[in-house]
């Protein structure tokens, strides 16, 4: 059964590629252009997973997931970072903020889907 997944990335091409991959796997996809924009999806969307970039304008991925984790309904929803960032310090900061996993761009669609299967029940 498909899951409801929010993709947050300031790159339209990344949003479209990820969306295409997930929709072809049977998932329902919502898209936000940055953390600030994506906050609107937290009320009433019943998300199963959030996939977010780290570096975005207006509100970056770390600040975004801190906002997500502050909502009672989203304290345990998995959050994957999909980013070009590979620094260990950033990964630790993301984990401390509430990230579930980390995927480096460019990504292989099959590996993205496998990562999703690991974190979404």
Give the residues covered by each predicted segment.
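Short hydrophobic/Thr-rich beta-strand motif most characteristic of the beta2 strand and flanking loop
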Residues: 26-33, 41
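Active-site beta3 strand of CheY-like receiver
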Residues: 45-51
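C-terminal output helix
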Residues: 107-116
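Receiver (REC) domain active-site loop signature in two-component systems and cognate sites
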Residues: 56
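Charged docking surfaces used in two-component/phosphorelay signaling
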Residues: 16-24
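Active-site residues of response regulator receiver
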Residues: 53, 83
